[in-house]
From Swiss-Prot:
Function text: Possesses E3 ubiquitin-protein ligase activity when associated with the E2 enzyme UBC8 in vitro.
Organism of origin: Arabidopsis thaliana (Mouse-ear cress)
Enzyme Commission number: 2.3.2.27
Protein name, per record: E3 ubiquitin-protein ligase RHA1B
Gene: RHA1B
Recorded GO MF terms: ubiquitin-protein transferase activity; zinc ion binding
Amino acid sequence: MGLPTDFKELQIPGYVLKTLYVIGFFRDMVDALCPYIGLPSFLDHNETSRSDPTRLALSTSATLANELIPVVRFSDLLTDPEDCCTVCLSDFVSDDKIRQLPKCGHVFHHRCLDRWIVDCNKITCPICRNRFLPEEKSTPFDWGTSDWFRDEVESTN
């Protein structure tokens, strides 16, 4: 009932791997040539980079921040915020999409704050370092205190 000792039956044949590599190479070549012949790129380069697997999965904190801090237009703010985004140092324009942190009220371009959360893995305000997520929603899950996990371990023994 364990793993097979001979892993050859689990391997992908070499010709399949080489074919996939060639297809990927041609896809990248066509994408690189599209701008030179006046066509838009068919790959979305704003999506997660294939060379950076750490960006493939957003942290729970980043997902929660996305849900808890809505994106609004700068002109829709009721308060009198700062004149510029302290992350990119660009002045706010009335059409800018921004996020205003609920606890401290600081305002940032939504892309600047998203990069702060995702790329830097921060859950604090870039200015005052106040946490913008409730403490109970930003703590990691503790497998040791999970009743389900404990029951599963006991049932396998």
